[in-house]
Amino acid sequence: ALGSVKLSRDAEFQGIMPVRGKILNCLKADYERIFKSDIITDLIRVLGCGVEVQTKKTKDLSAFDLENLRWNKVIICTDADVDGYQIRTLILTMIYRLCPTLIQEGYVYIAESPLYEITCKDKTWFAYTDAEKTEIVKKLEGRKLSINRSKGLGENDPEMMWMTTMNPATRRLIKVMPEDMERTMQVFDLLLGDNLQGRKDHIAENGYKYLDQLDVS
């Protein structure tokens, strides 16, 4: 994924920091384990703002100072599949645990990458959800179409990545909103904390809503 993303960025103002695989669940881990993770400490150093924790186990990471943040947006970009969503959640959890002010002050965003590329003659549409794909196909009913599904960033060529994910004029960003921090804490704890029974109950009560998103391959 790094190759296509790096080739599609504008190096004048966009920096790319790869995260290889799933990072540590920072909600369940103690600080000693968190700051032994090179992936996490490297990410914090790239951000430049330090961490908001009171512990001597932060290695050489500085105390949090928003003025030292090197970027005006922190954008999480992952594959458009269940593994990508989990990685996205783990990165959000890391920021929430170590640098919550970034969320509170509105610096954190999620980049949406398209699920489908739909081509009709010499024109191309991008669909970010199955519902969008259905709507586009319906509008083009009767015409010869080519529909390609893309689940991984590495499968997208740089031109497509620039148009859909990197170009500020055409990309889609979801701003992570801090409107209710108490509710945010409850959700993070439910999904990633130690409350196993609560998580089971939540899945039992709400799992049916997401059956179409299950990856059973």
Annotate each predicted stretch with a short phrase.
Residues 1-217:
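Conserved phosphate-chemistry cores used by DNA topoisomerases
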